[in-house]
Amino acid sequence: MDMSRRTLLKAQAAAAAAAVAGIDLPAEAQNLAAGEDIALKWSKAPCRFCGTGCGVMVGVKDGRVVATHGDMQAEVNRGLNCVKGYFLSKIMYGADRLTQPLMRVRGGKFDKNAELQPVSWDQAFDEMARQWKRVLREKGPKAVGMFGSGQWTIFEGYAATKLMRAGFRSNNLDPNARHCMASAAVGFIRTFGMDEPMGCYDDFEHADAFVLWGSNMAEMHPILWTRVIDRRLSAPHVRIATLSTYEHRTTELSDQSLIFQPGTDLAILNFVANYIIQNGAVNRDFVERHVNFRVANTDIGYGLRPEHVLEQRATHANEAAVSQPSNFDAYARMVGEYTLEKTEELTGVSKERLLTLAKTYADPKIRVMSLWTMGFNQHVRGVWANHLVYNIHLLTGKISEPGNSPFSLTGQPSACGTAREVGTFSHRLPADMQVNNPEHRKHAEEIWKLPPGLLNGEIGYHAVQQDRMLKDGKLNAYWIMCNNNLQTAPNTNTETYPGYRNPANFVVCSDPYPTVTAMAADVVLPTAMWVEKEGAYGNAERRTHMWRQLVNAPGDARSDLWQLMEFSKRFTTDEVWAQEILVAHPDYKGKSLFDVLWRNGSVDRFGLDEIAADHENFESKQFGFYVQKGLFEEYASFGRGHGHDLAPFDRYHEVRGLRWPVVDGKETRWRYREGHDPYVEKGAGWQFYGNPDRRAVVMAAPYEPPAEAPDQEYDLWLVTGRVLEHWHSGSMTMRVPELYRAFTGAVMFMHPDDAQKRGLRRGQEVRIISRRGEIRSRVETRGRNKMPPGRVFVPFFDASQLINKATLDATDPISKQTDFKKCAVKVIGVATAERGAE
């Protein structure tokens, strides 16, 4: 057929994306539109990978996904996909896909020291229920826990939070988003009283300058990067500045790169604020009407175990989140310490580049979009980093309007929609509510139709704390879903793996593939993936989007949602709730958790006749009602009327997502701004209505050093992260042949001078050693990542190179998010003789 200009451009873009990874596109990825001669059924879905939320069209034939291409009706990506997105059709069909439950069995009974053997779902659930009941009986709800995911669908995350909090009365539920988005979430709430960005992707087409803080968008958010570059090339006045600790593909295309000493981004942020004040660039009217000032407690520790010497020395380790009221003059004095000279000396960034950056923010005519991700958030002062970039936008009034936007990019497809909005963190409930707030618990109990006082008000164990408590034998029944924690947790040798094999613990892992984590578990449950189930994600711009089940999962694989709901049938309230609650509310006595949580007149109120006639829905047909619709509508009731309004369920299947709050059928692009946000009163201009006084907070916080730095023995900074071709731990992308061939294994990126000093050659095998553990990798002195002297980078996608054996389990003491970007290592070549002896 004839190819239109737009189709040709799309094909060229697809080829370019594949060329970046050094691969050819398969024929199915080039099939941009299905002709009548191709008997495929096409349906919409969001991409399975990052938090961008690209739309894809999924082609199905004979019960199998055989093709995907970018959805031209999707506003996010406009028909484009990155190289990972073009190979979505292959992620579900790895040769080692798990299709039946596995359990460590010897002589027909569970034995923690036995090998994993195939069992039935009933056998697996029966043993799980026995272990959960034993632990609850002997130790109570504090000894059971679950580690979830920003890759859970909204329905799965909501079901998990109900089962854990209302069923088992435990708040030991946390997502792997703790490792990537916790600092951003806490920064939003402490500044604006509500989580998630005020802007949206439309800002890309309006900004005059883009400032990237710790974000390699070209590889980690490539589709959004194309929008940045398109804006840059379309408008000659637009500029891009990238701040990082090393050079990468994003810095290559930036107008200015600022390579700073690890951790000193805080000093740069305070310098910019100081420049704005000293040069009369403060938007006084905005600040006086819309801003309060506070000062943070300092010397707050590093989130290590309480007995660690750094925690013992910290003045405010137990009061890390505390701040005090302040004023503009006090704030100006604090940031006034960050002079141009001091900042240059501390950061290693030249005065010229620092001034250019500061002038960009200070100029009232330049609309600025600040963008950040893991470089900011995986930081022992990540919450402060988020505060300090908001300070700049608030001082200048460059916020909540087209092109003026501080924007936190997300890493997982539903880190926003599931982890944050649903509230699967150990301290949260849906719609920004908190478990330690009695009024919030009361509201949840009313929506969930629970006895008053049932919900537990004690904040649960966060992700790193869960690993520590498993090791210490205090967390004994543990379920990991939709993540690969043993590969991605920090300090895994010392703090993570011991807990999995602790004889006192029973560990379950739900996963589609035999990951490192699955192989260490006591029970492995085979999980349905992506379009093998009906789902919903929420992306980085507050866009909620849904998809139908398009194919069936292989063998006995079941979705996380089915697993959670089916497992609840094995418990009655008498077995999991306190007797005083049942005595006071006898109507609940003897009921199964399934009946209390799901057959409650709310979740089960939509019948099977409402399911799309031309699509499967395994969970709903198993349980006899439209599960996903019931869960969504109950969940949505938390936020409607409170600034988190979601549209009716059916509307999402008609569109390519909607950005909340959705009021009177209309989505909101810019929050807190009159004329854009229906919650802002007429004549107010801006209202940050998450806070009672409707003002945002400027938080004064200084530079403080990282938890660990290089010394004479461990003389290199280690940075970890991702690469374009692989996603997270690689459990999906490493099973796609084209992506595997494009980047077959992790390497250690190093400056050539550092290699030469150590007598190392490119491609040579080396030992990367920290105070906690070591791995082997190979030296790379060329390529995409150009390291300054004294720093090395190792991606974490490779299960044969578990770089997190070396990382430090230091966290931001406020958000509890891990710092994967800063620890000290040494690198030693593997001698020929040593290799020969192995």
Swiss-Prot record:
InterPro entries in alphabetical order: Asp_de-COase-like_dom_sf, CT_Nitrate-R-NapA-like, MoPterin_dinucl-bd_dom, Mopterin_OxRdtase, Mopterin_OxRdtase_4Fe-4S_dom, MopterinOxRdtase_cofactor_BS, Periplasm_NO3_reductase_lsu, Prok_molybdopt-oxidoreductase
Record carries keyword Ion transport: no
GO MF, any single term: iron ion binding
Protein's GO biological process: cellular respiration; Mo-molybdopterin cofactor biosynthetic process; nitrate assimilation
Localization in the cell: Periplasm
E.C. code: 1.9.6.1
Chain sites annotated for binding substrate: F796
A GO CC annotation given for this chain: periplasmic space
Residues the record lists as binding [4Fe-4S] cluster: C47, C50, C54, C82
Cofactor(s) named in the record: [4Fe-4S] cluster; Mo-bis(molybdopterin guanine dinucleotide)
SMART domains for this protein: Molybdop_Fe4S4
Binding site for Mo-bis(molybdopterin guanine dinucleotide): 84, 151, 176, 180, 213-220, 244-248, 263-265, 374, 378, 484, 510-511, 533, 560, 720-729, 804, 821
Keywords: 4Fe-4S, Electron transport, Iron, Iron-sulfur, Metal-binding, Molybdenum, Nitrate assimilation, Oxidoreductase, Periplasm, Signal, Transport
Short name of any one Pfam family annotated for the protein: Molybdopterin
Annotated signal sequence range: 1-29
Reaction catalysed by this enzyme: 2 Fe(II)-[cytochrome] + nitrate + 2 H(+) = 2 Fe(III)-[cytochrome] + nitrite + H2O
Matches recorded under HAMAP family: Nitrate_reduct_NapA
PANTHER family the record matches: PERIPLASMIC NITRATE REDUCTASE (PTHR43105:SF11), RESPIRATORY NITRATE REDUCTASE (PTHR43105)
UniProt-listed NCBIfam families: NAPA, PRK13532.1, TAT_signal_seq
Biological function: Catalytic subunit of the periplasmic nitrate reductase complex NapAB. Receives electrons from NapB and catalyzes the reduction of nitrate to nitrite.
Similarity comment: family membership: Belongs to the prokaryotic molybdopterin-containing oxidoreductase family. NasA/NapA/NarB subfamily.
Stated name of the protein: Periplasmic nitrate reductase
Species this chain originates from: Methylobacterium sp. (strain 4-46)
